């Protein structure tokens, strides 16, 4: 069984889509998924009325207390998880990771996972120039205009060893399938 640590940041952009995809993949591939939320993710997830959805589907939601609590780093480094998925990732989280700042649960866990060669996958919606259409609570559409600095930070992530940037929520399934194949060969 594939074991995934799923980090959620305070990014509302594409959050409903990511949650739906993770629910589908968990059931389709019988995944073992533990969710770790940043402090702001808790606020945003509740604003989108997705807290109960996550709790019903994934049971145990762990919310950041500080950069080391809950102790995700230890679980990543001791092999409890096959991969660390951060989706969606805020522009702030992306910038911190791009510049080596590890002062939150998610950014510290990414840094430490990389040091232990645990595969890290990050979906930052701000990943290319132009616009992104997202859905707000109440199904209202919002067009976001990407800032050059955010796109540049995503490009920095793409060049980092140990991180794979996902361009869209649908890319998560490709990652899952790749790791399922690896597990079969072990």
From Swiss-Prot:
GO terms for biological process: coenzyme A biosynthetic process. GO terms for cellular component: phosphopantothenoylcysteine decarboxylase complex. InterPro entries: Archaeoflavo_AfpA (IPR014072), Flavin_trans-like (IPR036551), Flavoprotein (IPR003382). Disulfide bonds: none annotated. SUPFAM superfamilies: Homo-oligomeric flavin-containing Cys decarboxylases, HFCD. Transmembrane segments: none annotated. GO terms for molecular function: FMN binding; phosphopantothenoylcysteine decarboxylase activity. NCBIfam families: archaeo_AfpA (TIGR02699). PANTHER family: FLAVOPROTEIN (PTHR14359:SF19), HOMO-OLIGOMERIC FLAVIN CONTAINING CYS DECARBOXYLASE FAMILY (PTHR14359). To M.jannaschii MJ0208. This is Uncharacterized protein MJ0730. It comes from Methanocaldococcus jannaschii (strain ATCC 43067 / DSM 2661 / JAL-1 / JCM 10045 / NBRC 100440) (Methanococcus jannaschii). The lineage of its organism: Archaea, Methanobacteriati, Methanobacteriota, Methanomada group, Methanococci.
């Amino acid at each position: 069984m594939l074991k995934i640590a799923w980090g959620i940041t305070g990014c509302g952009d594409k959050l409903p889509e990511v949650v739906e995809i993770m629910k589908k993949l968990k059931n389709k591939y019988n995944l073992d998924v533990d969710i770790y939320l940043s402090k702001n993710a808790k606020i945003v997830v509740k604003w989108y009325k997705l807290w109960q959805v996550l709790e019903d589907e994934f049971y145990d939601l762990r919310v950041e207390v500080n950069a080391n609590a809950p102790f995700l780093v230890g679980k990543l480094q001791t092999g409890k998880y096959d991969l660390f998925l951060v989706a969606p990732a805020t522009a702030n989280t992306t910038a911190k990771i791009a510049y080596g700042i590890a002062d939150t649960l998610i950014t510290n866990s990414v840094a430490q996972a990389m040091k232990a060669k645990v595969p890290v996958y990050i979906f930052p919606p701000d990943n290319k120039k132009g616009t992104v259409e997202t859905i707000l609570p109440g199904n209202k559409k919002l067009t976001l205009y990407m800032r050059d600095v955010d796109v540049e930070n995503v490009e920095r992530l793409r060049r980092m060893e140990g991180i794979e940037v996902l361009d869209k929520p649908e890319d998560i399934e490709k990652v899952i399938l790749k790791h399922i194949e690896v597990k079969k060969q072990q």
